[in-house]
Amino acid sequence: MLGIVKMEGHETTDWSNYYQDTQEAYSSVPVSNMTQGLASMNTYMTMNPMSSSSNMTAGSFNMSYANSGLGAGLSPSGMSGMGAGSASAMNGMGSGVSSMGTALSPSSMNAMSAQQASINSLSYSGMNPGMSPMAYGPSNMNRTRDTKTFRRSYPHAKPPYSYISLITMAIQQAPSKMLTLSEIYQWIMDLFLYYRQNQQRWQNSIRHSLSFNDCFVKVARSPDKPGKGSYWTLHPDSGNMFENGCYLRRQKRFKCEKQQGGKGSQDGRKDVSGPSSPLHRVHGKSSQMDSSSSMSNPSSSPQSLEHNGSNGEMKPQVAAGPSPLSSHQNHSTHSLAHETHIHLKGDPHYSFNHPFSINNLMSSSEQQHKLDFKAYEQALQQYSSYSGGLPGMPLGSPSMAGRGSIEPSALEPTYYQGVYSRPVLNTS
């Protein structure tokens, strides 16, 4: 509007400078030439087909200039020259506007209307279900909920009580505080509808619960109450296993003290019959072997046993003559030690301090030296592949065969240090 006001303030000669484009220059728009301007605008609008949105924008932009020019032409300054021929000029203007209206009619906008129709045709119903997530909404909302038929209703559901809880409830509600097995079954079936089916399964569980729990005690029938089956009642020392009347979970487990006492007495008897003296506790296996050897030896006197028993030490004396059993044990011990030493290929100078070591089990020093030389021979055979053997001293030489003439310094680890790149004693 400010531009229009400024254009009205200037003279008609300055308007040619304001509009630089020759096609849109409507500076001299008298009333007599208004029809020619509108006709040129009509031809300009009809020459540009409105097949796209860009052409439509250009047409609307040119139409706005036409309206501004039209408004300027109809201003009071431009109307001053209007005379008797104003009616004919206005008729020409009306025809020009009508032609412009026909140019802007839907018949000339077929391309744009077709494009708009194609855009409007892209509804959610025609889209891919992955592109229109709301397409499934109405179908889900309009679906009627299916009425499901449950297998059993709520009263037929399994009760949240254990079998011990059911038995305890049945016994506690009885006037005599004891019931037979059939009465317990009947009470459970009357109270809970779930247990009216599959009776074979849960009745077996009831019997197992009665038999393997110390809180239930079987009471024999009295002569004044004939019938079948014994009575079951709660143990008098069981107390209140279900605190605050809550049978959902048993708070404490009852164990009969009499059975525990019987087990403890049996364990005590086993301890008494077992070895009790310090000698047996320290030398358990050796004392048993010595006692067995003394029992097998008939020459041992009972007086010596009584004398040793009075001193508080159980040391059975063995006769001076060696028994066949003891000699057999010594022979087996030596053979076992010999086999063990063959399998062990470690450092022969490493000594074990415990009493069952190989060095302590070997009786003679000669056997010890033989085993040491055997270990060295195995070590030399193992490392002969790396060094190619000693120069001038093969393994089968007489000097190597004479094991008794080897100096004691040869037994030291530093003796072979200059000969081999690796120490001989570390065979593992």
UniProtKB/Swiss-Prot annotation:
Bias (Polar residues): 324-335
Keywords of the record: DNA-binding, Nucleus, Transcription, Transcription regulation
Keyword Cell cycle: no
Compositionally biased region (Low complexity): 286-304
Subcellular location: Nucleus
Tissue occurrence: Expressed in the endoderm of mid-gastrula embryos. At neurula stage, expressed in the notochord and in ciliated cells of the epithelium. During tailbud stages, expressed throughout the endoderm as well as in the notochord and neural floor plate.
PROSITE patterns, sorted: FORK_HEAD_1 (PS00657), FORK_HEAD_2 (PS00658), FORK_HEAD_3 (PS50039)
Domain of life: Eukaryota
GO molecular function (one): protein domain specific binding
Any one Pfam family match given in the protein's UniProt record, by short name: Forkhead
SUPFAM superfamilies assigned: Winged helix' DNA-binding domain
Residue ranges: DNA binding: 158-252
Secretion signal span: none
SMART domains to which the protein is assigned, alphabetical: FH (SM00339)
Biased composition (Basic and acidic residues): 257-272
InterPro entries for this protein: Fork-head_N, Fork_head_dom, Forkhead_box_C, FOX_domain-containing, TF_fork_head_CS_1, TF_fork_head_CS_2, WH-like_DNA-bd_sf, WH_DNA-bd_sf
Main function: Probable transcription factor.
PANTHER family reported in the protein's UniProt record: FORKHEAD BOX PROTEIN, HEPATOCYTE NUCLEAR FACTOR 3-ALPHA
Protein name per Swiss-Prot or TrEMBL: Forkhead box protein A1
